[in-house]
Amino acid sequence: MKIQFLFVLLSSYLCFGQNKTEKAIMLYSIDQYIKPVYNLSTDAALELASRISKAAYTKNKNVSIVLLDASRTTVLRMRGNGVGPHNTEASRRKAYTALSTKTPTLLLLRNSEKNPDTKNQNSLPELLLLSGGTPIWYKGEIIGSVGVSGGGSPENDDWIAQSASIPEIGITTTK
């Protein structure tokens, strides 16, 4: 008898517990929450590295190259023969700086020297205000960045980094 009484008592909770009395919250369309992002692929990184190496070769230089995708993930990292190991980390930080600021690092360096309010940007831990970093663009969107070190001069590093383009398909270092 006690079991039947408990069953009757609890069955009402089970039946009425399933009623939904809350109103549904109106959500925005999916486009308000999720955006597609172009990203640098491994194949593109390999092609860019080949073009960068050829540009460095025309200046008789071996360089370290780091390519990051739009989410700051390292897609490719390579060090030319005879290039010091510190150059590879410098290349990564140049690429990070270019990606983070969406500005070539040589331009960023020169602009920060002119403006006392931005001169302390070099004190931020990951930013490296040395030439040789540049963002990589596709259809007006940043898809990654490149950092180049070991070119022998700031102008060489910048010029070599600017060669990270595949204009045939719209990948360039200019917006």
Annotated model-derived regions:
Residues 19-175:
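Flexible, solvent-exposed loop/hinge segments and secondary-structure transition points
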Residues 1-20:
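Bacterial Sec-dependent N-terminal signal peptides
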